[in-house]
Amino acid sequence: MNPESYTTMAEVRAGVDELDRQLVALLARRFAHMRAAARIKPDRGAVRDEARKAEVIANAQAEAERLDIPADVVGALWEMLVEASIAYEMNEFDRLRS
């Protein structure tokens, strides 16, 4: 799947669709890690860690810069991803202890 070899929009769209499937699969793996964190953390207050959140976003932005893609866009996406992950982890924390 090399976009440089595409000659039609159908190829572009098929490539994007495949990447989207892969991204969702990676998100499923990430959320599995959030379930593990919810199981391991001793109290609900430990779920939100602003220092770790900032570190994760900064790491993603640095990787974006390395790959020469817009770091500000990646930062905004990671802000949403981390907040969604925190919400998911809190729900899992509560579910496991109910």
Question: Model segments located where?
Answer:
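Domain-level signature for soluble enzymes in the chorismate/prephenate branch of the shikimate pathway
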Residues: 1-98
